[in-house]
């Protein structure tokens, strides 16, 4: 028997930062930054989070600063 393809339109991801009118991404705001980090401690890509290119660059800088300051871990603990 032939398999039926199930498909639908994928919902477009919304930029969380732009949607909530966050103008400045602060490296001390670890609750916000943790939304964009995987369980392993890696920075999630744009295609997963839906952030714009500009906000992704700001996020990356803020996450790296928070790691250096010791606010976020470089890798997850097992």
Curated annotation (Swiss-Prot):
PROSITE patterns: RIBOSOMAL_S18 (PS00057). The keyword Transport does not apply. One of its GO terms (biological process) is translation. SUPFAM superfamilies: Ribosomal protein S18. InterPro entries: Ribosomal_bS18 (IPR001648), Ribosomal_bS18_CS (IPR018275), Ribosomal_bS18_sf (IPR036870). Signal peptide: none annotated. The keyword Lipoprotein does not apply. GO terms for molecular function: small ribosomal subunit rRNA binding; structural constituent of ribosome. One of its GO terms (cellular component) is cytosolic small ribosomal subunit. Pfam families: Ribosomal_S18. Keywords: Ribonucleoprotein, Ribosomal protein, RNA-binding, rRNA-binding. Part of the 30S ribosomal subunit. Forms a tight heterodimer with protein bS6. Belongs to the bacterial ribosomal protein bS18 family. Binds as a heterodimer with protein bS6 to the central domain of the 16S rRNA, where it helps stabilize the platform of the 30S subunit. HAMAP family: Ribosomal_bS18. This is Small ribosomal subunit protein bS18. The gene is rpsR.
